[in-house]
Amino acid sequence: MKQATVLESIEQSSSTSGWINGFIGVLLFSGSMPATKVAVLELDPIFVTTARAAIAGILALICLLTFKEKRPTKAQLMPLAIVAVGGVIGFPLLSALALQHITSAHSLVYLGILPMSTAVFAVLRGGEKPKSIFWLFSILGSLIVIGFAVLQGGTSSPVGNVLMLIAILLCGLSYAEGAKLSKSLGGWQVISWAVVLSLPVSLPMMFLTAPSHPELISTNAWVGVAYLGVFSMFIGFVFWYKGLAQGGIASVGQLQLLQPFFGLALAASLLNEHVSSNMILVTLGVILCVAGSKKFG
């Protein structure tokens, strides 16, 4: 009886730690779009993308060597390549390009369908068969976002909207692939090896696209790049994957739904961007759809 009580206590403690770590991860991710917006106002989007990947890659390499982590097998290289192409290069680059045309507040609306994108790719890649109501919520959420983009009309760039949609699709694919791979390779090790394997591309490209007069770039832009590399691309994932492992993917994964709200608050407070009531309503609508697809899927 006492043994069962002790085990329940340990499980409850682990679950609580998982929620705390997951919350920290989401909180760190929430600064990604505002930080990217600040950076691309003065820096080449390709430089911002490769610099964040290179910074994360160097930090990850140090950690992998320090903890003497085993190298990925040949069978794990292809999934890692998908994570790298989608999550390390694709999503950051496309979102950075999109933020040259739209505000970070506008882009955050699209993050509301990221959990849905991940779930769809989990179905396609993992062979899961969710209930029909899952697809109902998925389609409804997508229509809300598309409708929002269309209704913006001249106040929003079609180029920015399309780039964000493609970015979300790539990110969803990389998340789903990474989730599968983490079962055999480990959570934080997946993102670590992905950014390390990207170094042969990210490091040279960072220097090739670096500004010719770095002294003319504002401190805010450099802080944005540093934040993206250290927190968004690396430390955030360490907390996120640790939280998923401790508290369970299904439960802790719900915390990702808070990201648009945190991001909108940062966009309004740090960038003085206008957050319209429509943005808030659309974000809330998408979150309700994602929650529904999670519950009934």
What are these regions (language model features)?
Residues 2-50, 93, 153-180, 201:
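Glycine-/small-residue-enriched transmembrane alpha-helix faces in small-molecule transporters
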Residues 60, 81, 121, 130-152, ...:
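Hydrophobic transmembrane alpha-helices of multi-pass small-molecule transport proteins
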Residues 30, 54-58, 142, 199-200, ...:
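Small-residue-rich packing faces within the transmembrane alpha-helices of Major Facilitator Superfamily
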Residues 14-19, 42-46, 50, 72-78, ...:
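Juxtamembrane helix-entry segments on the extracytoplasmic side of multipass membrane proteins
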Residues 49-51, 92, 106-113, 177-200, ...:
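Helix-helix packing/entry segments at the starts of transmembrane helices
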Residues 60, 118-120, 124, 138, ...:
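Transmembrane alpha-helical segments that form core, pore/gating elements
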Residues 27-28, 32-33, 61-111, 147, ...:
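Specific transmembrane alpha-helical segments of multi-pass solute transporters/efflux pumps
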Residues 2-11, 51-54, 150, 221-223, ...:
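C-terminal-most transmembrane helix of multi-pass membrane proteins
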